[in-house]
């Protein structure tokens, strides 16, 4: 058996990141051992500024309260308690690379990443569903490997405020990196479906992101979310323009390219097919192709396409749901489990849509969870509870 190794650099980054947001919980009472007593001399409450540990998490009271820490507005989240070195995904695997038809660690061992995708940053981003608390939950409680940060280009996204959304992406990359997560930077073009429509904006965005974060070993780049309404040749033409922009700054960057038919290798369009990519693949190394599915709508035909494509190309399922492709409707966990089994067997990495409290059934949390900053299991929707269990499986 070959031993997995960790370079001194990746180990140092992992150790720094795993402890960057750890709270000092020493000499702090643990709930229900209240710091303040009632007139009978029994521990009963907290005063303004008092701290209390609950579920390995440090909270501070905003005002007098006898409520359970973390369950209401009376408590301010401080951070996860530092209980020792937490081995992060980045510390474990180092800089990722493509080897053969799979994703591999720095030690060239085949791996599978499992994690979550954000919703659109313009709706559920920084300070809303993506906060210190929610990222701690994703990293430490869910034990995710990767967070996909979905930056819509249109629909109130990047094109409305390029500087503001680029800065938000910078901050979120730093926050996720501090927890040792892999970060999938998602250029979420959707409508218009031709990625060439946004090619100049993409060049500007990736130049700024890659330049600032080129020292990191945990970033992955998805340059085209869901190309649609155009043939594979148009997607390939776009990739040929954007990939060199990234590679000129970070030569060993791992880059993902969406495929025609909403990233289905043509399965979701009438005149496209996997053969289009086989005949004319992207002419760069260290490239993966993305595949998306929604299990209630995309059953055997799409599942077979994923199976076929992953025999030939390195594939990353950067978005999927257990429901309809609208992101809503009933969950189909039978179809979803078939996909999970296929991806586990072939070590296909995935990120599930989505880590938010959006009203649709595809969101992990119930509406209002982000506003209250309550990300407990009691706040999970059916899909959220199911996907959390899949991320934790075998940990």
Name each model feature, range by range.
Residues 40-46, 125, 129, 160-167, ...:
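Soluble non-cytosolic domains of exported or imported proteins
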Residues 17-19:
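N-terminal signal peptide c-region/cleavage motif recognized by signal peptidases
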Residues 1-8:
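Bacterial N-terminal signal peptides that target proteins for export
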Residues 122, 153-162, 189-196, 224-230, ...:
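The substrate-binding groove and active-site-proximal loops of carbohydrate-active enzymes
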Residues 84-146, 159, 390:
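N-terminal carbohydrate-binding accessory modules
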Residues 199-220, 224-349, 353-357, 362-393:
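Extracellular glycoside hydrolase catalytic/binding regions
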Residues 23-86:
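Tryptophan-rich substrate-binding surfaces of secreted polymer-degrading and adhesive proteins
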Residues 131-192, 199-204, 247-249, 335-346:
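Aromatic-lined substrate-binding rim segments of carbohydrate-active enzymes
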């Amino acid at each position: 058996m070959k031993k997995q190794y960790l370079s001194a650099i990746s180990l140092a980054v992992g150790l720094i990141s795993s402890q960057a947001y750890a709270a000092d919980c020493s000499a702090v009472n643990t709930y229900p051992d209240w710091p303040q007593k009632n007139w009978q001399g029994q521990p009963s409450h907290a005063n303004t500024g008092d701290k209390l540990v609950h579920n390995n998490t440090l909270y501070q009271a905003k005002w007098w309260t006898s409520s359970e820490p973390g369950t209401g507005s009376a408590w301010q989240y401080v951070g996860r308690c530092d209980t020792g070195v937490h081995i992060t995904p980045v510390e474990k695997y180092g800089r990722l690379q493509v080897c053969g038809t799979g994703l591999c660690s720095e030690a060239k061992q085949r791996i599978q990443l499992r994690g979550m995708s954000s919703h659109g940053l313009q709706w559920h981003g920084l300070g809303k569903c993506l906060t210190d608390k929610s990222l701690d939950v994703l990293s430490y409680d869910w034990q995710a490997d990767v967070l996909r940060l979905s930056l819509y280009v249109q629909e109130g996204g990047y094109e409305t405020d390029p500087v503001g959304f680029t800065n938000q992406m910078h901050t979120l990359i730093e926050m996720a990196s501090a927890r040792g997560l892999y970060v999938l930077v998602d250029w979420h073009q959707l409508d218009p479906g031709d990625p060439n429509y946004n090619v100049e904006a993409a060049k500007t965005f990736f130049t700024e992101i890659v330049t600032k974060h080129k020292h990191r070993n945990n970033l992955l780049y998805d340059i085209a979310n869901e190309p649609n309404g155009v043939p594979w040749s148009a997607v390939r033409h776009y990739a040929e323009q954007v990939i060199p922009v990234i590679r000129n700054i970070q030569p060993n960057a791992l880059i993902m390219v969406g495929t025609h038919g909403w990233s289905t290798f043509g399965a979701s369009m009438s005149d496209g097919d996997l053969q289009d990519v086989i005949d004319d693949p992207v002419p760069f190394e260290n490239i993966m192709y993305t595949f998306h599915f929604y299990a209630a709508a995309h059953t055997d035909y799409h599942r077979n396409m994923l199976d076929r494509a992953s025999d030939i190309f390195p594939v990353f399922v950067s978005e999927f749901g257990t429901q309809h492709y609208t992101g809503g409707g009933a969950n189909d966990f039978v179809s979803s489990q078939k996909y999970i089994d296929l991806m586990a067997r072939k070590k296909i990495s995935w990120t599930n849509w989505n880590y938010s409290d959006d009203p649709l059934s595809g969101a992990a949390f119930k509406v209002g969870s982000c506003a209250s900053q309550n990300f407990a299991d009691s706040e999970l929707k059916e899909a959220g509870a199911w996907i959390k269990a899949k991320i934790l499986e075998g940990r």
